[in-house]
Every structure is written in C-alpha cells, then in structure tokens.
C-alpha cells in the first residue's frame, strides 16, 4: 500500500502541472463542418453576442462571459488567430487548432489540440471539457490522463468572453486574465473583426502587449497587429 501511495504521489507531482495546458484548449460541432480558406467573415459589432455588462472597467477582478453558448454549435474545429503567450504552447510555431466533439455517453466534450512545431513536427494533446454551469459559457478543461481525472484538481477555467451570432469567431480567456485566444472557423478573419475583438479584450482588462498572431498554412489575409 505504501508503495502504491508513493507511486501515486510521484505521478501527481509530474502530471498535475500539465493541467495548465488545458488553457490551450479551444471551444464543442455538431462535428465540424468544412471550412473555407476564403475570407467570408462578416462579423460586425452588432453581430457579436456581448453582454452589456461585459464592457467593464479593466480593473475589475474577473472578466464577464457571454450570456450563453450553445455547445452543439460551438463544437467542431477552431483555428487560433492569435493568443497571449502560454508556456505549454511555447513549442507551437504555427497551425494551431482545437477540435471539440461531444462524447456520446454525455460525460463531457473531447478536446483535441494540434499545432506544428518549429521543424514541422506535429504536436497533439487530448483533454476533456465539461460545462461549469448551465450557460455553456464557462468550461472546465483537463488534460490529465483519464485514469486520474476524477481528482478535483488540474482543471482550468476556459471562459467565452465574446462570440458572433453564427459561431464563426470567438474570444476565449481565463478569468485571471493571464491567457487569451482569438478563434475562428477559418484561418482568415477581417481586420475589422480582429480590431473589434482586441477592443473587447482590452475593455475586459486583458493586457495585450504580448498578444501574438498565429501563422496558419492557409492564411490569405495579413492582419495588422
């Protein structure tokens, strides 16, 4: 028994820090539909589903989420347009995506994160997301091994701060304001959409000095940071 306890303790010491990688997750499609590489983004200020209270003073302790997220519409593959630096993404040089698929047994949402390293090496991580409440706008995500996910640790908060009405673009961040991702169904969005989401992030209190755009193989639009 002592040997088992010691083994488990060592495993936890190694594995639990990996839970921070869950912030690298991106939002569940009716499994994903085919996305075009052509820029078809028509997001405007009016189509962004933003709660009025989300426009808060940046000194507020926590950001505000959208009122609701339909997880079936939210499912599928998302391209990372840009992000704040994150340790567990330090080896991702380009082509960052996240695919969400609802589990048939209703136990949660499978999250598959992928990216390409500096030398073109494929990097993949699999995790499990669960809604934190009935709005769907807050997810608890874990990348711990399945045999240890029952522990009440290693789950990162993943909040949808803004999205458009068609679930084509979304802004996701952590409540401590350390991490932030701009996501889209296509690797291309307009400069107008990019600027609007940056504005929302700043109004929510996120520091964007280190925000970086993500290179995608099929990008045809060069955004101005």
Language-model segments: residues:
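A beta-rich soluble binding module of mature secreted/lumenal proteins
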Residues: 2-10, 17-225
């Amino acid at each position: 028994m002592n040997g088992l306890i010691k083994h488990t303790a060592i495993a936890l010491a190694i594995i639990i820090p990996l839970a921070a990688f869950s912030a690298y997750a991106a939002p569940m499609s009716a499994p994903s539909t085919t996305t075009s590489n052509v820029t078809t983004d028509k997001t405007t200020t009016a189509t962004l589903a933003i709660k009025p209270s989300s426009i808060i003073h940046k000194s507020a302790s926590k950001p505000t989420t959208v009122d609701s997220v339909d997880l079936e519409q939210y499912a599928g593959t998302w391209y990372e347009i840009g992000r704040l630096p994150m340790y567990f993404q330090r080896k991702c040089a380009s082509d960052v995506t996240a695919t969400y698929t609802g589990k048939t047994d209703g136990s949660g949402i499978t999250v598959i994160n992928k990216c390409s390293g500096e030398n073109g090496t494929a990097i993949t991580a699999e995790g499990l997301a669960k809604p934190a409440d009935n709005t769907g706008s807050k997810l608890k995500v874990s990348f711990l091994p399945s045999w240890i996910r029952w522990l009440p640790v290693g789950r990162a908060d993943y909040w949808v701060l803004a999205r458009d009405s068609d679930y084509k673009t979304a802004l996701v961040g952590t409540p401590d304001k350390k991490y932030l991702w701009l996501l889209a169904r296509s690797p291309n969005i307009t400069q107008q959409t990019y600027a609007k989401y940056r504005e929302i992030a700043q109004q929510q209190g996120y520091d964007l000095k280190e925000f970086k755009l993500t290179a995608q193989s099929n990008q045809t639009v060069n955004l101005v940071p």
